[in-house]
């Protein structure tokens, strides 16, 4: 995700307040946590069919537990699939089909239309 420059403390507080309002609306209307939303945006921007969960944890700086929980929820919603590496069972990857990519794109567009 890109870095946004914040010029002063007033701007920081204003942005934070607005972000919290948007995230609360996303959580209530679209039933998505911030971690789930982060993963969906990560997948949408990546446009690949397979993602290593360790890379998402490293990029997001979220605790692995929260990412695992979010991935399971997204899997339950049919937005992604999970698979384990055949050579190393400890390694988990996210797989995203073309149909799932389309669902993710449409969901993110719906969220943008509702929020922005």
What spans do the regions from the language model cover?
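General structural signal for secondary-structure boundaries
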Residues: 1-5, 50-51, 63-64, 95-99, ...
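Aromatic-residue detector
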Residues: 10, 28, 42, 48, ...
């Amino acid at each position: 995700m890109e870095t946004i420059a914040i010029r002063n403390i007033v701007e920081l507080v204003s942005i934070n307040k607005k972000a919290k309002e948007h995230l609360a609306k996303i959580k209530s209307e679209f039933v998505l946590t911030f971690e789930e939303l982060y993963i969906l945006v990560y997948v949408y921007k990546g446009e690949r069919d397979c993602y290593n969960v360790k890379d998402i944890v490293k990029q997001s700086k979220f605790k692995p537990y929260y990412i695992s929980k979010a991935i399971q929820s997204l899997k339950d919603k049919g937005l992604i699939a999970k698979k384990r590496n055949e050579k190393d069972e400890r390694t988990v990857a996210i797989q995203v089909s073309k149909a799932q990519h389309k669902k993710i794109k449409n969901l993110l567009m719906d969220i943008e239309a509702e929020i922005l």
